[in-house]
Structure formats: C-alpha cells, structure tokens
Amino acid sequence: MSNAQLVEAAFRQRSAASAVVMDSAGDRGIALESFAKARTQFEPYARALDLVNKHITIRPEDIKDASAAYQELAEKLVEKLQWPSGAIRVFPQGSASTQTLIRSPDRTKFDIDAVCRVVIDAGYVSNPLTFFDDVGKGLEGLVVEAKNRCWKVNFPNRPYYIEFTPSVPLESVHIDKNGNDLRRLVAPGYIDTALAVVDRETKTWKTSNPEGLVKWVDEASKYKLVRVVMLKAALEHVMDSVRPVSEQEIAVDDTLRIAIRLFKRHRDMSVFHGHIDRQFQPISVILVTLLTQMYYGLAELGRTFENSVQLLVQLAELLPHMVPSYPTYGYFIGNPTVEGENFAERWNTDEGERAETFAKWCKLLRYDLETILSAADEKTIEEKARKVFGCTRDTGPSDGGGGGGGVSVSPTRRPPPPPRTQGLA
C-alpha cells in the first residue's frame, strides 16, 4: 500500500470524527489578499514553533562531544581487538541522524544511537554472538551494559550515553542459517546501505538499514506542505537574523522535522506529567515512521496548509488511524527500508497497553494543538505553545539534562480521558 493510500485510509477511518482543518483539495485554491496578510497569518505560529524548537534543541557542543566519544569507541576497538582501522566505520543512527534529537524535560541524559559497521572475517559469519561479545570485550574498562542489539555505554558526568550497535555489511552475511537470502528483504533503492545486526534473543543476524531510513526521511522533508507563498513571505521577515543551522538545529520551514521534534516533545511532556505511562509510550522510531508516511501521503495527495499548526493538527488527527492491525500479524508498523521488520512488534504482546496509550496520547496531542490554533493573538499563541511544550523564558539550545531554566510543570487542562478500549480499531 502506498503512502497516499495509507493516508486516504486514515482519512476514511476518522471521517466520523470532527471536521479536519484542511480536508479538501479545493482549499488550495483560496487566494490570499496579499503578502502582508499571509505574513500576518503565518508569523505568530512560526515564531511560537521556532521558540519551542530552539528550547528543545540540544547544544551543538554536546552533540560534538558525543560524536567524538563514539569515534573514541571505534579507536578503542581497533586497539583492543587489533582490527584494521579501515575495517571499522562508526556513524549515528536514530534521532541523531535524522536531526530530531531533543532535550529531555526531566533532566535525564540524552542518548546517542551509533552504529559500528565492521568488515568481518569469515569466522564471524556463522557466529553473530561471538562478534557481539568481542565488541563488548573491546569496550572493557568503560561502564557498559549488554542489550539485545547494542551495547549501552554510560559516561559519568556527561549529559549523554551512547547505544553502540555492532553491525556488518549485509552482503557479508546475506545467507541465513535456513539458506534464505536476506538481501531480498531490503526495499529497492536502499540495498547499498543495508546492514546486518546481531539479535541476541534469536542468536541470528537481523537486517537493518539506519542510513536508508535517514535517506527516506530526508527525501520526504523536501516537500513543502505549508503554502509556499506564505512560507517565503513569513520566513523573509522572521528568519532574517537567524544564524546558520548547525547539525542538530533545524529551521522552522523544515516542517517534517519540526513535527517529529514537537510530537516527541509532547509525548515526553505527557510522560513527565503522568498522563501516559513511560513503559508504554510510543517509541521514537514509530513516531518518525508514521509522521514521515503521512508527510509523503499528504504531499502525494496535493494537500497544503495555511500555517504550521494547521499541518500539525492534521497530522495529529490522522496519527491514530495510521497503525493497521491484521488478523495474522496484529499491529504492524513496517520499516520502509527493510521488508518484514515490525516496529510495533511489542504492541502485540502487552494486552493492548501500547495501542491504548498511543490512542490516549493522540487525543491529548490533538487537543493541545487545537488549543494553540484557537488562540486569537500572537501573545496568546506563544503562551499556549510554551505551556503545551513545557518551555520557560530560556529558549536557547540546552544540554540533554534539561539545562537552562528548567520546564514548566503545571499540567495543561485536559479533556476527559478516553474510555478504556482494546486498542486501535
């Protein structure tokens, strides 16, 4: 099913709900009276979202320090395991690679996901656990914890930790123990970056493609769903004095990454205030995947929006309807670069807790975004945005442990909680 078809199905599923902000192609034809009017309409939302985005951005110096730290891990492996330096390549994955890494509202450390790609010798091909354990031996002397697919490396007195995933080029282990070619699982266009990682639970190699996922998000982010004429007019006025965007700072016109960041922040604030259970919160890769699918789908359907908050509301309205459930597989959120990988695998083993939490959070998210959208003036828009996303008057980038002036902890007034159900329909 294409992204457009997924979005159309989501529209149909929520058709009985309240009217959407921008739900007809005809809306695209409404003429704006002038650039001044366009700028006036867009500017307050652009300012408010830019303020929030800057507040949740992690300081560039902390990102630089973390990047140096994972390169040091690679050097440690070369030294301890006597692997050729040219055989190891380390690069970020997850939020750090998609530029959607954000600071935590509760002063906890931020995590950097890094992939350690190693060109292995033949002895490791049939012994993935030995490869994984040897990487662990190479990290001896550090504070490490073995997880299912990575080594968690903690750094005392630093605002981050690193989840270090050993991997190999898929080409080197592409035939599994049953004689199946793992390369057939890789989506067309992403084979060059495909990897195999160790799955300790099954004691096998599993296909992965973090760089492919980054490429997929990058391609989607090029679509502009907020009307171009408004965006250009507003940005010329709002962004004149903004300094060049660094690695983890994104401009307000990058509406896909802004959406991912803000939705992740809202999820974190919902956990922080106790509105949803941390154990069952939607994981970041699910939010990235669903939002990017919707973004592609809306672009393919020709949807455009008058301002960024309207786009966010539309995404929030569609979000709970983007997770299909099948009689055979249960809930399924597929990796767009690796066929068969289900990011929602744990949704099918928790008696509906994650699906139920997701549905509840989506309702809270939509309510809060509509609260911002309903504001009548710039001051109120900013105040509501600050409250929803837990921002203080300190709006600059900060460290992952909260930094700055902390966060607002007074909970936003909420609608009545949704009734308990068996999960998403």
Q: PLM ranges: what are they?
A:
Residues 83-87, 145-146, 278-280:
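Short helix-terminating capping/connector loops at secondary-structure junctions
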